[in-house]
Structure formats: structure tokens, C-alpha cells
UniProtKB/Swiss-Prot annotation:
It comes from Bos taurus. There is a cross-link at residues 52, 143, 148, 298 (Glycyl lysine isopeptide (Lys-Gly) (interchain with G-Cter in SUMO2)). Keywords: Acetylation, Activator, Chromosome, Cytoplasm, DNA-binding, Glycoprotein, Isopeptide bond, Nucleus, Phosphoprotein, Proto-oncogene, Transcription, Transcription regulation, Ubl conjugation. Transcription factor that binds DNA in a non-specific manner, yet also specifically recognizes the core sequence 5'-CAC[GA]TG-3'. Activates the transcription of growth-related genes. Binds to the VEGFA promoter, promoting VEGFA production and subsequent sprouting angiogenesis. Regulator of somatic reprogramming, controls self-renewal of embryonic stem cells. Functions with TAF6L to activate target gene expression through RNA polymerase II pause release. The modification Phosphoserine is found at residues 6, 62, 71, 81, 151, 161, 293, 314, 329, 344, 347-348. The modification N6-acetyllysine is found at residues 143, 148, 157, 275, 317, 323, 371. This is Myc proto-oncogene protein. Residues 209-238, 279-288 have a biased composition (Low complexity). It holds the Pfam family Myc-LZ. Residues 266-278, 315-331 have a biased composition (Basic and acidic residues). Residues 201-359 are annotated as: Disordered.
Amino acid sequence: MPLNVSFANKNYDLDYDSVQPYFYCDEEENFYHQQQQSELQPPAPSEDIWKKFELLPTPPLSPSRRSGLCSPSYVAVASFSPRGDDDGGGGSFSSADQLEMVTELLGGDMVNQSFICDPDDETLIKNIIIQDCMWSGFSAAAKLVSEKLASYQAARKDGGSPSPARGHGGCSTSSLYLQDLSAAASECIDPSVVFPYPLNDSSSPKPCASPDSTAFSPSSDSLLSSAESSPRASPEPLALHEETPPTTSSDSEEEQEDEEEIDVVSVEKRQPPAKRSESGSPSAGSHSKPPHSPLVLKRCHVSTHQHNYAAPPSTRKDYPAAKRAKLDSGRVLKQISNNRKCASPRSSDTEENDKRRTHNVLERQRRNELKRSFFALRDQIPELENNEKAPKVVILKKATAYILSVQAEQQKLKSEIDVLQKRREQLKLKLEQIRNSCA
């Protein structure tokens, strides 16, 4: 069996229909071999940790034909293809039945209406939408296809045309898996709290549109420009489609640049839940990339315009004008300062002249007083009393000498005074003695 898988991987350029039966048979046996060991309990949606944390790139790219052959959605389809009982005897589908199931699953309107528009499956839709918050695209895709197969088998069983090859093991497996999904969905948040529009609207046929119509709508391309068309037509992006009408290329050319920026911002604010739900389930049946919408090109144009808006060429022309204005204002200030400087020297000269005049007057007065003092000093010196042409130095020298001589004479006179006073005292005493003797 592994030889068939490797053959399918190497010869990916061959016809898809020739490789598909071998691939499903191989994965079917491997899955049920593991399922028998786990007592017919299918793995929980969050059991495979590596698939849970295998994140898609942002924005998600369309898978190639080679990756589509080994996508986990095919594994899930193969894993939930009905077989017989646990003994594995004679209850498996043929390759033609499996191909018919896959074609009805991916492209049939009956499957889309029974799965998406059925009000009983609302919990499953909520579960897929809310749990797909970590861009776990592969596990969400496998879960989606498995749930579609389970609901399709239940619909065929209720319709009275059950497959004769399906046994009790397949029914118990699908019922247990649906119970697990319903229990997980009860723990999730209701999308009606987040999205204003109802999930299932029977009056409007827009939520039940076929994958072809949703794949080529301009609003879906604007929300997911690089993701492939998914078979699940979820109501959330269609609710956004009703909010934001599709913009054609002619309308986008007539819009202004600021309106384009506002439109892009509004789409980005509304789209994260829908983008996550859509990118989490890449389709296994469509291998061609959808055509790029004009809104995506408009987004690129807005990004380049934002980059140009940071440094537009019009401001480059404004810089020299601002510089010229600054230069002109600087010149005017320089002229005003020069005029002030030209006027200030005149006033300063007059002020300086006045100061000089006052200074000269004061200096003359000081000199005159000094001369008068010298003349008075000269008159006090006996040697220079009549010498009018005596210089100042001679006057000062003679004055000092005269002062010293006067001080010496003064000292002599003081000593004489003291002697005379003593003499007087003595004379007084004698006088008194004489008076006493006479009496």
C-alpha cells in the first residue's frame, strides 16, 4: 500500500482520476487499522497537536496540484468512507462509488443545501468558525470534509436508500464523531454575538450559493485575494458581502484616493473572522487559482500611495519656497538691524561726545584744584613762597622737609612747656611756704 502513495506523489502530473482510487483505498485501510486499535473511537478535533499548530502563511497561498493530492481533506474523506464491521469482511465501497461520493461532496448542490442551509447543522458551522482562530487550516479542512460525509450518509440513510455495504461499525463511528463535535461546539462562542446577520437565512438564496458563484464574486476575492475557492459557502463572508457592495474596476478608478483608503480600512476591520474561517478550509477539489479582483490591485495601489504620501513630490517644491521666505525674512531683519546700527552710531557718538565733554570738564576741574593745592602748599613753604615757577616735585620735597622741621620744633617746644610747667609748680609751692612763714 505505501507503494501506491509514493507512486501518486511522484507521478503528480498524471491524470487525477487514475491516481485517486489508489490513494483512497490506502488511506482507508490505514485509518481503520488505527481505529480498531483505539476501540472504534475517532480522534478528537484537537488530538493531533502537530496538525493543530501547523499554521498557514498569511495571506494563505493556493495549494498546488501536488500538495492537493496529499491534503488532509482527502485523508479525512478516505477515513470516513463507510466500510463493513470490525472483521472487515465484504463491506467496502468500490472506487467508482468513492469517486461519486467525492464529486457529489465537492460540487453537488444537494450536499451544499443539506449541509450548509440545514438548521440542524448550525452548531457544526459555529464550531468550525469559532475554533478556527489559530489558522489551523489542515485540521479544519479535515474536520469539514468528515462532517460533510457524516451528514451526507445520515441524509441517505433517512431517505430510504442506504448503502447495502455499510455496516454497524461505520454508523457508530459517525455518530460518536458527531457527538464529539456537538460537545465541542457547545463550549464555543455563538457567532450570532459577533456577526449581526443570521447564519441561516432561508428567504435569501445568497448564503446557499454554489462554490462557483462564491469563488468568482468580487467581494469574496477582495476578502481572500490569494486563497482558493472553498466548497463551504459560509454565511459570514456573505454577510460582509451584503454590507460592502462589490466595487468594479470602473468605479474604483473614479473614486478618490482618500475614499479608497477608508474602504480598505473598513474591509480590514470587518474581515478577520471571515478570513480565518475561509483560510482555515482550503478546498481539495479546486486546483486553479481564482482571478485577482480589482480591489486587490487597488490595495497595492493604496499601499504605494501611502508610501508616496509619506514623502510626496509636491512638498519637495514647497521646501525652496519656505527657504526663500526664510531668506527674505532674514534679509528684512538684517536690513532693520543695519538701519538700527546706522542710526545708533550717530546717537552713540553724541552720547560719547557728551560723556567726553563732561569727563573733560571734570578733569579740568580736578587739575585746577590740584594746581591750587600745589600753589597753596608752595605758599606755605618759606623757601618757595615767591617762586611761582617751582615745579610740583620741588614743592612736594620742600613741603616734606618743611613739615619735618616744623614737627621737630614742635617737639622742642613741647619739652620746654613741660619744663616750664614744672617750674611753675615749684614756684607755687615756695610761695605758699613763704606765706605760711609770714603769717
